[in-house]
Amino acid sequence: MDRLKLELPRKRYISSRTAREIRERLIELVLLLAATSSIATMIAIIFTLVSESVAFFQEVSILEFLTSTQWTPLFAEAHYGILPLVSGTLVTTAVALAVAIPLGTMAAIYLSEFVTPQIREIIKPCLEMLAGIPTVVYGYFAFLFVTPLLQKILPNLPGFNMLSAGLVMGIMILPFISSISEDAMRAVPVGLREGSYAMGATKWQTAWRVVYPAAISGIFSAYILGISRAVGVTMVAAIAAGLEPKLTWNPTESAATITAYIVQVSLGDLPHGSLEYQTIFAAGLTLVLLTLGFNIAGHFLSKRYREIY
């Protein structure tokens, strides 16, 4: 009888332990499936882009694709030079970064170093709300408000132009840069700030000469995320910058970006498997490689200037 009483708790313990191990294994399996699904999705996207692009480059020379200054794949006299789309993408991105990087950095410094916690809890959510506005709303805001405003300053500015598109794209990516940069600055140890104050530095000097350099790795990551976001913006560029593929580096002119062209062609009724249809995937692969290049550069810079505390 006594032995039976001792065996019962032991069996309950073993049963409980087995059930806990099963739950842990199930959780691990779910997490593994989640991680695997994201990797599988990326592999599927790359496979689709590459397979269709290979078929495209069997008909079009890679040299022509990379060096030709005309992009007219839907015309009777077709040209397949990606440079006009790349230039439009880079110009709008450069204008966006010229707005978002200084404003986002200053906003991050203010939220991290100067504002009180109560005011931060009001300002930061309002700033992050900009990231939740649909891009089509930004596009029409650029076309119907920003462009007419700029035309009062620049009378010869056309209705479609990369300047207004880039300015609004800068506002759109501002929350990404400011929020991540602020998180990086707030992660800087308090001891660095106190040491700076002890040396007689002002709050601004501490923020700019101590905190900002110490957080530069995370801030670079914010900049790269902003670049990747700007490069991939579709509706703002399609609505405000126009759909005319043109090799120009002048932001006051109209042009087409890679994403805008993809939208333009995908809304048509091109036959599946045609050369014109395959230009979508060649342009998409170019966009992926462009974004990948920015991400690799950002990773290198972040690693190069990373501080370990």
Name what the model sees in each region.
Residues 1-35, 298-309:
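Transmembrane alpha-helical segments of polytopic membrane transport and secretion proteins
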Residues 180-181, 185, 197, 203-241:
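Transmembrane alpha-helices
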